[in-house]
Amino acid sequence: MAQVSMRDMLQAGVHFGHQTRYWNPKMKPFIYGPRNGVHIINLEKTVPMFNGALAELTRIASNNGKILFVGTKRAATEAVQAAALDCQQYYVNHRWLGGMLTNWKTVRQSIKRLKDLETQSQDGTFDKLTKKEALVRTREMEKLELSLGGIKDMAGLPDAIFVIGADYEHIAIKEANNLGIPVFAVVDTNSNPDGIDFVIPGNDDATRAIQLYVTAAAAAVKEGRSQQTATEEKFAEEVAAE
């Protein structure tokens, strides 16, 4: 079972919040107190909340659910992409385009355009174009890849989103709320925990802390996927035995 310990969190700096003057009073239940002008997050709250979130991610993945990892702030981009790919899930790590979930029909058309351009770049179509036109299409493809590359194979809305930085990704959270998609989010002391189904109180800026969250989430998803595979294999064996 994917779990994270208090020691893991301390070493990653999960407990360091923001300067006290930037706090959001709604985070008071999760704050231990101030130290040198910085709020310290109460890890005795965070540890069980995070491990509960991981257990739910495992359950969703075991039912063939799709998880969308979201982290577009600079400190999160690489870790979010690597974790999503590691557990064969989906990600947005560049910029959240308004309507990415709530206007999925339009997003799907953009994904189709991206896939068409990818095909053209590989089947020799680009070679038949003028240099200028080939360059225009290449740039369009690169731009679409940056925004949609992590969701181009998602084939429909996700069953949950795992967010690094509730404050930074408030648009993604609002869209998920509108559609009833469960939200798992790391919430720092300056953020609003409202609208988040699984709150993970913690530092959302430190690279090591972000690495800890997404690595654990990916492990939880992989565990769920392996449970699903085992269940399917057992069912196949039972059918064959009848």
From Swiss-Prot:
<dbReference type="InterPro" id="IPR001865">
    <property type="entry name" value="Ribosomal_uS2"/>
</dbReference>
<keyword id="KW-0689">Ribosomal protein</keyword>
<dbReference type="GO" id="GO:0022627">
    <property type="term" value="C:cytosolic small ribosomal subunit"/>
</dbReference>
<dbReference type="InterPro" id="IPR005706">
    <property type="entry name" value="Ribosomal_uS2_bac/mit/plastid"/>
</dbReference>
<dbReference type="InterPro" id="IPR018130">
    <property type="entry name" value="Ribosomal_uS2_CS"/>
</dbReference>
<dbReference type="Pfam" id="PF00318">
    <property type="entry name" value="Ribosomal_S2"/>
</dbReference>
<protein>
    <recommendedName>
        <fullName>Small ribosomal subunit protein uS2</fullName>
    </recommendedName>
</protein>
<dbReference type="GO" id="GO:0006412">
    <property type="term" value="P:translation"/>
</dbReference>
<dbReference type="InterPro" id="IPR023591">
    <property type="entry name" value="Ribosomal_uS2_flav_dom_sf"/>
</dbReference>
<dbReference type="GO" id="GO:0003735">
    <property type="term" value="F:structural constituent of ribosome"/>
</dbReference>
<comment type="similarity">
    <text>Belongs to the universal ribosomal protein uS2 family.</text>
</comment>
<keyword id="KW-0687">Ribonucleoprotein</keyword>
